Curated annotation (Swiss-Prot):
Belongs to the eIF-6 family. SUPFAM superfamilies: Pentein. Pfam families: eIF-6. GO terms for molecular function: ribosome binding; translation initiation factor activity. The keyword Protein biosynthesis applies. This is Translation initiation factor 6. It comes from the Archaea. Binds to the 50S ribosomal subunit and prevents its association with the 30S ribosomal subunit to form the 70S initiation complex. GO terms for biological process: cytosolic ribosome assembly. The keyword Ion transport does not apply. SMART domains: eIF6. Keywords: Initiation factor, Protein biosynthesis.
Length: 221
């Protein structure tokens, strides 16, 4: 299967789309030829919407099988669309680009280290997972420096051994370093994945795909 895809010619598919085990949330104007690739590779239902009237879905949405977290600036129509699939938590104040500042799966969530304890407690209650503050190689936007599924976590190659150890302790899953699109360390910008499969931005090398498959537990094709 061809694992390479772009959104309007842009390989940063993790910025524009967000994938879960059952749905892929994409901008309304993504062509059917692209959404078909998502359906086939990831076994998902396609949900078309903007968030905050913006196409950068991946930067503004995050969550797990228990709930979705989005910017509080989402419109009523956007909230109604997403509410059909999960309960929603709205980030009303401060940093609200949820997909940038939160990394989450059904085992854990890691957040921008400047988020306060009250927020972390609320997020933990909502997603039903332990929440830790974290940087990945000194990058605070952990949601774009890594990709987490319920099978493994791909992190930036700049991630320190201590940061990897902390992730392994909180999620009890394989954690490994990887890149996309020929050396992009912000793997969350160019990779989407779930328990069934993955897609990477156009330009990702075969070696990079091999690392992704190894960490997330997919057999090489």
């Amino acid at each position: 299967m061809d694992r390479f895809v772009s959104i309007a010619g842009d390989p940063h598919i993790g910025v524009f789309t967000r994938v879960f085990d059952d749905i892929a949330v994409v901008p309304p104007d993504v062509p059917e030829e692209v959404t078909t690739r998502y359906e086939e590779a990831l076994k998902v239902e396609i949900v078309r919407t903007t968030i905050q009237r913006s196409p950068i879905i991946g930067s503004l949405l995050v969550g797990n099988n228990n709930g979705l977290v989005i910017t509080g600036m989402a419109t009523e129509e956007e909230i109604a669309t997403l509410s059909e699939y999960r309960d929603l938590m709205l980030l009303e104040e401060g940093m609200n680009a949820a997909g940038n500042i939160i990394l989450a799966n059904d085992h854990f969530a890691a957040v921008h280290p400047e988020m306060d304890e009250e927020f972390m407690d609320a997020l933990s209650d909502f997603l039903k997972v332990p929440v830790i503050p974290l940087t990945l190689g000194d990058v605070k936007t952990v949601g774009m420096a890594a990709v987490a599924t319920n099978s493994g976590v791909v992190v930036s190659p700049r991630t320190t051994p201590g940061e990897i150890q902390r992730l392994e302790q909180v999620c009890s899953l394989p954690v490994g370093k990887g890149t996309v699109t020929m050396g992009n360390a912000m793997v969350g910008t160019g990779l989407v994945a779930n328990r069934y499969g993955y897609l990477a931005g156009v330009g990702t090398s075969g070696y990079e795909l091999g690392r992704i498959e190894d960490i997330l537990g997919f057999e090489e094709e």
